[in-house]
């Protein structure tokens, strides 16, 4: 009986210790509200959660999903999120309206923001109208006055406007119907519009339906990054937390660089979680079409010690473009051109955090 009591006492002590450990662990893990869209850059935090990397860094990533970049920016004042991924275009408005930081680069989406047309479109009859952009389809005559379905103030909008510019046209020369990417696909499939602007992975839905690429950001002479964005107030008050978030993200980037298309099965699972169905072959293509950059590469890209950094130059091109379009007021454009919202201070902290 005495031995039994000892065992009961021992078991109770063990249970108490385990409970204390669990309580301590729970106290160490902090819910982190993050913002994303159903696309490539979001695979990293999703994969991190599957692997438990967020917990190892002291976080529980809460992934808040949005249909567009501007919807993400509009949710920032309510503090629905404090860090996450968005396009380089909505990033400008996040900086202007909410004083948000650009804290890192998620990927390069230059070839996955595209203008698509139906296979029988007269737009496809002309290729290389502008000799500077030989792979771009269309002509002023075949495009002017047409209706284009697009998500305005987005990376896709940039793709569309670059296409028009390559043809000597502007947004004013066409009719733009603003809707989110999924709505764009549904409407274009019903016969609405003459062209549709999509980014991955919705772009692949269009390609599966037989639609053809008339132009993308790269063929029209541009570059568009997906960036990691941070709420300024949160970032300034919690620099080490931001660095730990970035460390987890770079853990994912390193996996993408080392594993590449081997991650296609997991990537397809991620897309299904996000509400999109994609085959493993399509998943491989999406992985291949999204270059990512390591921490060391990004430290160089953000380095402005000898003048304008690469990231500042990329964002400056976007600012100039949207100022010329009239989407940014001249004073807003001048403010953004200084690059005040682009910072590498959190990147530099990444090697110092555990």
Predicted regions and their residues:
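Short, glycine-/small- and polar/acidic-enriched structural segments
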Residues: 27-171, 175-178, 194-200, 216, ...
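Pocket-lining segment of extracytoplasmic ligand-binding domains
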Residues: 183-273
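Secondary-structure end/capping motifs
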Residues: 237-327
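Bacterial N-terminal signal peptides that target proteins for export
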Residues: 1-11
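Sec/Tat signal peptide C-region and signal peptidase I cleavage site
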Residues: 18-26
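Solvent-exposed, polar/charged alpha-helical surfaces in well-ordered, non-transmembrane soluble domains
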Residues: 51-52, 74, 78, 92, ...
């Amino acid at each position: 009986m005495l031995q039994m009591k000892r065992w009961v006492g021992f078991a109770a002590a063990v249970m108490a210790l385990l409970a204390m450990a669990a309580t301590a662990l729970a106290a160490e893990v902090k819910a982190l509200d993050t913002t994303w869209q159903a696309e490539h850059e979001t695979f990293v935090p999703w994969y991190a959660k599957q692997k438990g990397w967020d917990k190892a860094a002291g976080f529980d990533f809460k992934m808040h999903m949005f249909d567009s970049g501007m919807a993400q920016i509009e949710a920032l004042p309510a503090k629905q999120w404090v860090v996450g991924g968005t396009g380089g275009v909505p990033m400008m408005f996040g900086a202007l309206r909410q004083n948000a930081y650009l804290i890192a680069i998620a990927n390069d989406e230059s070839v996955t923001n595209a203008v698509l047309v139906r296979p029988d479109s007269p737009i496809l009859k002309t290729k290389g109208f502008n000799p500077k952009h030989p792979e771009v389809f269309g002509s002023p005559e075949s495009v002017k006055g047409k209706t284009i379905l697009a998500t305005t103030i987005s990376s896709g909008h940039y793709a569309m406007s670059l296409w028009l510019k390559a043809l000597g046209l502007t947004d004013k020369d066409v009719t733009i119907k603003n809707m989110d990417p999924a709505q764009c696909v549904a409407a274009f499939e019903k016969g609405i519009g003459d062209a549709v602007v999509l980014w991955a992975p919705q772009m692949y839905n269009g390609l599966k339906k037989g639609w053809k690429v008339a132009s993308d950001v790269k063929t029209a002479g541009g570059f568009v990054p997906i960036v990691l964005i941070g709420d300024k107030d949160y970032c300034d008050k919690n620099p080490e937390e931001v660095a730990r978030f970035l460390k987890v993200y770079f853990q994912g980037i390193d996996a993408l660089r080392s594993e590449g298309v081997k991650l296609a099965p997991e990537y397809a699972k991620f897309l299904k979680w996000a509400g999109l169905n994609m085959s493993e072959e399509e998943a491989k293509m999406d992985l291949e079409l999204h270059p990512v950059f390591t921490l060391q590469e990004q430290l160089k890209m953000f380095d402005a010690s000898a003048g304008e950094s690469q990231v500042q130059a990329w964002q400056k091109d976007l600012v100039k473009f949207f100022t010329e379009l009239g989407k940014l007021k001249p004073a807003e454009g001048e403010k953004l051109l200084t690059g005040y919202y682009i910072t590498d201070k959190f990147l530099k902290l990444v090697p110092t955090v555990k």
